[in-house]
């Protein structure tokens, strides 16, 4: 009684598992069908280790539209993804990865691992400047500003005045923007 090879893994899929060939040849003493079944049973409890928790690959910058990161090391045949997997605004988000089936992390668990990912602030290239002039007329007046977009910047300081003179306004990037030098404070 001889058995041919038995493939106990892989199956041609892309799960990253390793196939093991088991065969039985009754010409060797001490090997029985029970021994082969024990080997098969041992293989059925094998776990496959995921070597690294996925991480954000590349960077995202605020666009005003929904974005999702590309993940280095993510394979849907080995794990599920959950948590926050897409966002619109600049900031930090948290996704989770959980092994499925026979897959485990290097610590031997199938616990969900949290991974932070980010959308960076978009850049405001120029500080606004007053365009034209304002002449005293007895009423409160506000200047016009070049390069000012209220969705990108808030305006502070003296925004309007009645009397002749020099005044200072300040501009601060909103939460999705930064100055071209990387700062977010008023200028």
What label would you give each PLM region?
Residues 1-45:
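Short, low-complexity N-terminal tether/leader segments at secretion or assembly junctions of large
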Residues 46-187:
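Solvent-exposed beta-strand/loop surfaces, strongest in extracytoplasmic domains of secreted
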